[in-house]
């Protein structure tokens, strides 16, 4: 098991980042890869959770230990795998998630990708009261301003990778067409819109 990895960020894609350390490039799947854009070619530290399957060894990465803790609590729920948990963690703060679980707000929980009624009910059953020690925000990142449309396209790719449907994202993309934000900012704003 790994706690974290520290190395040079050498690549960013819609689904993962690549961190090079000691001559090896590690593929680390993260909730919002573009939140690392301002750290390209710099030394970074990412908290890890390793998933070992018959056909693959996967690394899931997080900005903070709190973000990792939310992820671990989510994958403890029957019906929630690492990819779905990562999509939930991608929402900028966990206030809505915690409130929905503590208030048994099944409709809110069903707004997350791949979460149906049965899984939402299981989340409430398994996680009620277990997030009390976590802060309201799980991430603390910034990014540099770059060309808007390319950044918007990258954000939409990342949201597709998290499991959102193209039909949902078409409306969101149209809303942001005339704006100039970073991919990270687009993702945060889009997630807030999708959760309403």
From Swiss-Prot:
Gene3D superfamilies: 5' to 3' exonuclease, C-terminal subdomain, DNA helicase RuvA subunit, C-terminal domain, Nucleic acid-binding proteins
Compartments (UniProt record): Cytoplasm
Highest rank taxon of the organism: Bacteria
Cystine bridges: none
Region (Domain III): 147-196
Record-linked InterPro entries: DNA_helicase_Holl-junc_RuvA_I, Hlx-hairpin-Hlx_DNA-bd_motif, NA-bd_OB-fold, RuvA, RuvA_2-like, RuvA_C, RuvA_C_sf
Pfam family, one: RuvA_N
Region entry Flexible linker, spans: 143-146
A GO biological process held by the record: DNA recombination
Subunit-level organization: Homotetramer. Forms an RuvA(8)-RuvB(12)-Holliday junction (HJ) complex. HJ DNA is sandwiched between 2 RuvA tetramers; dsDNA enters through RuvA and exits via RuvB. An RuvB hexamer assembles on each DNA strand where it exits the tetramer. Each RuvB hexamer is contacted by two RuvA subunits (via domain III) on 2 adjacent RuvB subunits; this complex drives branch migration. In the full resolvosome a probable DNA-RuvA(4)-RuvB(12)-RuvC(2) complex forms which resolves the HJ.
Name of the protein this chain belongs to: Holliday junction branch migration complex subunit RuvA
Taxonomic lineage: Bacteria, Bacillati, Bacillota, Bacilli, Lactobacillales
